[in-house]
């Protein structure tokens, strides 16, 4: 079990890194969008490639961050019911949900989306828009994002089993790390006192 917990920590580290990188992608999307709008209204120039790169980046933010959201224990769930159970009861509910809902859905989407990506790659599929981009990178984001979600679900499963065996702390507790803004607010508050 210790080897599995070590694997779980590795998966968590990868997912955390991807989640942190996605923050920068949001900034890039905003800059591209603003730049496109400024160019369109000031020099009357616009390209479909700018619009498409925005939705490529949006997909690159949204799909991998499903795993990050699972790591942070922020996914929508049946908290109304599970909050009435002890930590062990919640762990059993999470194990059931991972095994019978999350994993089958994620594996199904991964399996069904892979041939779509392969077809786009092999045919060098291009966007229908004039000046558009190649499509296969966008198609790759779907199986890639769901692969990350499957890996994170496996990590969450391992942590729940480890918790039930008394080998790790309760993984259902939400991370309570402060954001940079919250840390700055605390520093300012301490200086004012």
Q: Can you describe what each PLM-predicted range is?
A:
Residues 1-193:
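Alpha-helical transmembrane segments and membrane-interface helix-loop junctions
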């Amino acid at each position: 079990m210790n080897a599995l917990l070590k694997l779980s920590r590795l998966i968590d580290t990868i997912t955390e890194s991807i989640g942190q990188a996605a923050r920068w992608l949001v900034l890039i999307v905003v800059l591209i969008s603003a730049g496109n709008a400024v160019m369109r209204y000031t020099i009357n120039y616009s390209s479909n490639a700018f619009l498409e790169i925005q939705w490529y980046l949006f997909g690159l933010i949204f799909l991998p961050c499903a795993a990050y959201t699972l790591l942070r224990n922020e996914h929508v769930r049946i908290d109304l019911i599970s909050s009435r159970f002890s930590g062990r009861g919640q762990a059993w509910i999470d194990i059931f949900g991972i095994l019978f809902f999350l994993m089958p859905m994620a594996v199904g989407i991964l399996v069904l989306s892979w041939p779509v990506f392969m077809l786009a790659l092999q045919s060098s599929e291009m966007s229908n828009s004039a000046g558009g981009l190649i499509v296969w990178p966008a198609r790759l984001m779907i199986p890639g994002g769901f692969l990350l979600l499957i890996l994170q679900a496996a990590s969450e499963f391992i942590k729940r089993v480890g918790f039930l065996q008394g080998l790790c702390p309760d993984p259902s507790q939400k991370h309570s790390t402060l954001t940079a803004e919250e840390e700055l607010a605390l520093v300012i508050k301490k200086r004012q006192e």
